Amino acid sequence: MPQRHHQGHKRTPKQLALIIKRCLPMVLTGSGMLCTTANAEEYYFDPIMLETTKSGMQTTDLSRFSKKYAQLPGTYQVDIWLNKKKVSQKKITFTANAEQLLQPQFTVEQLRELGIKVDEIPALAEKDDDSVINSLEQIIPGTAAEFDFNHQQLNLSIPQIALYRDARGYVSPSRWDDGIPTLFTNYSFTGSDNRYRQGNRSQRQYLNMQNGANFGPWRLRNYSTWTRNDQTSSWNTISSYLQRDIKALKSQLLLGESATSGSIFSSYTFTGVQLASDDNMLPNSQRGFAPTVRGIANSSAIVTIRQNGYVIYQSNVSAGAFEINDLYPSSNSGDLEVTIEESDGTQRRFIQPYSSLPMMQRPGHLKYSATAGRYRADANSDSKEPEFAEATAIYGLNNTFTLYGGLLGSEDYYALGIGIGGTLGALGALSMDINRADTQFDNQHSFHGYQWRTQYIKDIPETNTNIAVSYYRYTNDGYFSFNEANTRNWDYNSRQKSEIQFNISQTIFDGVSLYASGSQQDYWGNNDKNRNISVGVSGQQWGVGYSLNYQYSRYTDQNNDRALSLNLSIPLERWLPRSRVSYQMTSQKDRPTQHEMRLDGSLLDDGRLSYSLEQSLDDDNNHNSSLNASYRSPYGTFSAGYSYGNDSSQYNYGVTGGVVIHPHGVTLSQYLGNAFALIDANGASGVRIQNYPGIATDPFGYAVVPYLTTYQENRLSVDTTQLPDNVDLEQTTQFVVPNRGAMVAARFNANIGYRVLVTVSDRNGKPLPFGALASNDDTGQQSIVDEGGILYLSGISSKSQSWTVRWGNQADQQCQFAFSTPDSEPTTSVLQGTAQCH
């Protein structure tokens, strides 16, 4: 009688036979499908039950499958879990040990990618990266490897002493992928045709192109635009540069036209060379600022860290001193409550003060940039273009303070900046810096001056209040930024004296928040002041969103302006899926009040088609109506619209997308991000990618996933619920880690053709033995004969395919047959046929 691994309700013989027929071929072929019942029970069957066939032929030896996790050796696509944490997914080769259980083979390079201290283990350090390790347990004592075949999951347990301790979110630089060679262009084209009641007509077009070429780690980029109206048309090159990453420095090297970061001095454009650190190359948990938490555990303990009442970190630590440097703070301020729970249950607590400003760095982390070249003037400005050099650095001194500063110099301009930022504990975070600049203009007038800057930030979790204030003060009218210093014909009589900016937000109760923001600038030599103030309230209740906003502005060369707006947004899911209706009222000084009604929504299974209808009317009876739609396809996004009002009508149109030239051909795509992926489905068309609406492989089997996160693991999965009927995939998920600007390749091996249940008989017309292994002589695809001599095959076409069937090692225990589908179009997704094996 069959035996169950787990207790459960009893099955009838008929039910058991059905389970055998459906599940065993799946397990034996390595499909990775779990053979379970509705109650998720796993069954074990004694092979003795299966040793007799209808034909009386000797069956295949299935004794190896009587042991848990025992399967056929080979290469499997598996999820790798290391110490109960998923670390990657890749193809691993398995061999059978003396107990017929599968054990994994690793190369030394793969062990290095897993974070094993290869160079510190003598038995591994002396081997090349391509060397194969058959038994990891013999090299690293205490290691265990278990292959969960049903879930295609390889569980590794490796002592912590043999592993590097990596920060959360860490991805080994050995996995950073430069990508494959490519040429591409990103384009955005828009146009409009305006017709006026008087009979006039105007047309405009605009084309934005971001072009690129990748070869190895190098990235060549060009940004150009084209504009056209009724009178003129023009091409403009915005910038061109060559860039690559420097992994050892976690930095980017750039040659060409770009702009400085503006972290210390005001940003400006240049032509030259720049080397700057890239925080994207750091693990997620080490970006930005967070303090290093240190303490001492008296035993094996659990350390829990809370911020604003939420647990943001929890980990097991050994007895003795510990250090935690990979926190993800939940907000910019809010002290950290650290709890140490010892093995006997006793607890100790202490408070780690915490507040942060944007420039603050973690203890010991250096962020820098070094730039040299020629200042690059704006296209329409009258400016000189001197040679210059700039260097900036920001260094995390400790848990409290960050130091920063910079130098900038050219023939007629010198600037020095220095500052310090720090946490004030419960009082928030504060930074103060001072810049001195010496400037000489073409008319030999010389100036020098100082700029003081103070920034303050504070979160008050008890009241859900956020406060941010910045104050700039210029000691005299002689301070000029580098942009201002290079501008000819400068108005020296309008020099800024000070500026204050503030932003306050307050959550008053769940779903409702208030905000206030504003700024004021005043100037030397006059009493003029520019002011801008905004206040508002917003919230959401029962799915209905609302906001009320007021803005006041005053500028020296303009009249005071006041504006009030009210917005309501109501979901229509009950009547019209994925749609909302909204109302907006806008009242502005000296202008008629305007009312607008709008309907927005999306259609098709993944929202690829979006639409909007809008009607507006003001108090002077001016009206405007519009209809717009856009469609997001694998080859780009297409949009069109029409609007008309009292005096005019307008047609508008546009298309955005990308064109990618790669080693296998040309693929059209949606608009590309910084890094992207080329999907290769081995010629299968219509294969969709999860979480990327509109993305599907083209008739050649290629698609482009337009945006990925650089230096982090990205999961690319096929939407198996919408696979074409003639496509089977060997694996449905790939993980990629692209470098900045890279196009990485993700290949999904597809069997293209039809699914067939073929009854195979021997030369005497008798069914082949149950459990015999059938292999495709060309593709290597495998299947298992069931108890009726039936094989499940996929990827079958009208072209004849040769298969070899084996049920032993003797010459009379194997045969061959050929099979193909009819030339006519099949009417079902799973065909049936017969074949004779010789």
Curated annotation (Swiss-Prot):
Span of the signal peptide: 1-40
Chief place where the protein resides: membrane
Outcome of gene disruption: Deletion of the operon under classical laboratory conditions does not result in any major effect on E.coli capacity to form biofilms compared with the wild-type strain.
Keyword Transport (UniProt): yes
Annotated localization: Cell outer membrane
Annotated GO CC locations: cell outer membrane
SS bond list: C815-C837
Primary role: Part of the yraHIJK fimbrial operon. Could contribute to adhesion to various surfaces in specific environmental niches. Increases adhesion to eukaryotic T24 bladder epithelial cells in the absence of fim operon. Probably involved in the export and assembly of fimbrial subunits across the outer membrane.
Protein known as: Outer membrane usher protein YraJ
Organism whose genome encodes this protein: Escherichia coli (strain K12)
Lineage: Bacteria, Pseudomonadati, Pseudomonadota, Gammaproteobacteria, Enterobacterales
Name of the gene: yraJ
